[in-house]
UniProtKB/Swiss-Prot annotation:
Record's cofactor remark: Does not require a metal cofactor.
InterPro entries: Cas_Cas6_C (IPR049435), CRISPR-assoc_prot_Cas6 (IPR010156), CRISPR-assoc_prot_Cas6_N_sf (IPR045747)
Assembly information from the UniProt record: Monomer, binds precursor but not mature crRNA; is not part of the Cmr effector complex.
Protein name according to UniProt: CRISPR-associated endoribonuclease Cas6
Signal sequence region: none
Gene that this polypeptide is encoded by: cas6
E.C. number(s) listed in UniProt: 3.1.-.-
Protein origin, superkingdom: Archaea
Protein source organism: Pyrococcus furiosus (strain ATCC 43587 / DSM 3638 / JCM 8422 / Vc1)
Pfam family, one: Cas_Cas6_C
Amino acid sequence: MRFLIRLVPEDKDRAFKVPYNHQYYLQGLIYNAIKSSNPKLATYLHEVKGPKLFTYSLFMAEKREHPKGLPYFLGYKKGFFYFSTCVPEIAEALVNGLLMNPEVRLWDERFYLHEIKVLREPKKFNGSTFVTLSPIAVTVVRKGKSYDVPPMEKEFYSIIKDDLQDKYVMAYGDKPPSEFEMEVLIAKPKRFRIKPGIYQTAWHLVFRAYGNDDLLKVGYEVGFGEKNSLGFGMVKVEGNKTTKEAEEQEKITFNSREELKTGV
């Protein structure tokens, strides 16, 4: 299930600030909403190790400006983000929690819930072109240190495949399909501060994926790569009927399709 969550700022006549490093705040909003509706589920999600089976996009605005040298952009009109999960209980708890508490505090801004819209999912995934709504993160430990793997390395693809198969087992309880290939068309790195002193280099991508439809659907629903519950790995399918906002986000993320091309 996939939702568009649209928020209206407290003061509609002025711009609102959105820090570039904001995933942590959205994570807090999501967990607090789930907790207010289903405390047991929130505790389980907080304590369970491994994938949480949900993901969300970066925070966006209907119109925005990027002042030079500042750690935030300015948003106008409404703000919004996308949320996706394959677990109905998580979806229900989030929606109910947001409706119960429509006043939303994010960073130093106050918003009010404007609408929650259920989005139509694609009927087919094999051979589709995917565009990230939040960057994809892949990490390994090398020589005792955490290393963020780029899509120029083959290990990037094997890790994503293994991760998808693990999520498939969690979602369906069956042996995962093995058919999976990923062809990156465009890649753009972004470095994020997850928490004070903790950083992650992740990748905004345009890529084609081939393989079992159910396996690819897992990536679409709960995210590709790692740290999905921290706001990484959400994608949309290019050509699928989507919202005007998602199309605008693609334009912002990829100002030029020649910025950086790669393929392994």
